[in-house]
């Protein structure tokens, strides 16, 4: 017989994003190789984290129950990952993905994560915002 399998909401959310053509293209076009293994580049991963945060925030605003830790985790991950960017990266992305990044950055800029709260030294919240803008909103 068939046995139902519980899939974590975070995995389900990521799967839904991957079914989107624009995000699938983002995944394919921003692959890198690490020791012969295909991985997603940092600049390619950040839009997925931002989109997950946007989707979860919209579900929460619509009255659905969402895991608050998951919402904050995606936002914090964007901050952590942004500290790895130099600012000159130019990820291949569609206008739809760019529009999502613009929406995310508008929300993020009004309430940025303090890198110090994530134990990241030597980088301020405004520097994170600026590098994200230079990479995704150029």
Regions found by a protein language model. Give the residues of each.
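Compositionally biased terminal segments of proteins
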Residues: 1-138
